[in-house]
Amino acid sequence: MLIFPLINDTSRKIIHIDMDAFFAAVEERDNPKLKGKPLVIGADPRQTGGRGVVSTANYLAREFGIHSAMSSKEAYERCPQAIFIRGNHTKYRQIGLQVREIFRRYTDLVEPMSIDEAYLDVTENKLNIKSAVKIAKLIQRDIWEEFHLTCSAGVSYNKFLAKLASDYDKPHGLTVILPQDAEGFLATLPIEKFYGVGKKSVEKLHALHIFTGKDVQQVPEMTLIDLFGRFGFDLYRKARGISNSPVKNDRIRKSIGSERTYGKLLYNDEDIKLELSKTARRVADSLKKHGRKGKIVVIKVRYSDFSTLTKRKTLDVPTQDFEVIERSAHRIFDHLTENNSGVRLLGVTVTALEDSTREELSLTADDFKT
């Protein structure tokens, strides 16, 4: 007997993106000498008297059983040849936020779970792409081309299944769980692999001879509720692929921007300014489309060595005028420290946004005339 009806919305298109060994991958990218070696992000126990914990480890180190939250001492005992790096969390956060902006090219319904993973609802999306799988592939492509980092993607009709799918084929995998396949997929899954089922719950379930999703599917709903309360209620539904929690995006949009990665590096200032102008045009058009204007213009320049500079200019009054944004972007670029490396990415963003219907006068190109 069902306590509540099993309402299952299978019409949604949800993607879960999980960066692959994110911190370690960034360090390998920035220091090629680390590639092909077991790498641990965490304090070196030989320098701390055995204190410290592992933040993450690359896949080579994981083959030795090293994982997040393990003591650095145990990690060293498992793999004495591992390289330990304390890591640069400011750098990881900056890159993670930049990756998040890639997600928002496709949808504003982005729910970050941490700096290196997020849910995206692409049921309706900015590019009107019908296939969630195609969007997932495009995101993987964008992240690789712009950051030389990989991610794994899971695609399904709810967050629970998308999360399981992204973990199924790592690194750089893409797994899809269709509605008709969900119960069969879950039936074979060990209960400890169910996202949201903690260690203590696993122990209780094992004590009841419940080891897989199939075992859960065979237990009556009321029995699970009697044994586990609300957790049992949720588990009964999850084992059947039912989870209707929305992708929550409480973020108030504070900026509108556009950026592009170039397959051929830009070296000439004239070429760079031409591309900045094109980008400024896209931003101005987007501001007008959304009825917004902003007071701060920001440009982003990423060079061939992956170093990134962001500089801003604060205007006297808010604007959505293309020529103002273009002129500001050019002036910011003119004041950047000279860098002989080629430019691989350019971005222009207008921030400190407000409603463009407000009565204050907006800045126009005439304000630049002398």
Curated annotation (Swiss-Prot):
**Domain UmuC stretches:** 14-198
State where Mg(2+) binds: D18, D116
Cross-referenced PROSITE patterns: UMUC
Q: Which GO MF terms does the UniProt record name?
A: damaged DNA binding; DNA-directed DNA polymerase activity; magnesium ion binding
Q: Which UniProt keywords apply?
A: Cytoplasm, DNA damage, DNA repair, DNA replication, DNA-binding, DNA-directed DNA polymerase, Magnesium, Metal-binding, Mutator protein, Nucleotidyltransferase, Transferase
In chain numbering, the residues marked as site (Substrate discrimination) are F23
What does the record give as cofactor?
A: Mg(2+)
GO biological process: any one? error-prone translesion synthesis
- Could you tell me the EC number(s) of this protein? 2.7.7.7
Q: Record's family?
A: Belongs to the DNA polymerase type-Y family.
Q: What does this protein do?
A: Poorly processive, error-prone DNA polymerase involved in untargeted mutagenesis. Copies undamaged DNA at stalled replication forks, which arise in vivo from mismatched or misaligned primer ends. These misaligned primers can be extended by PolIV. Exhibits no 3'-5' exonuclease (proofreading) activity. May be involved in translesional synthesis, in conjunction with the beta clamp from PolIII.
What do we know about how this protein assembles, alone or with others?
Answer: Monomer.
Q: What is the protein named?
A: DNA polymerase IV
- Name the species this protein comes from: Streptococcus mutans serotype c (strain ATCC 700610 / UA159)
Upper lineage is: Bacteria, Bacillati, Bacillota, Bacilli, Lactobacillales
Which gene is transcribed and translated to give this protein?
Answer: dinB
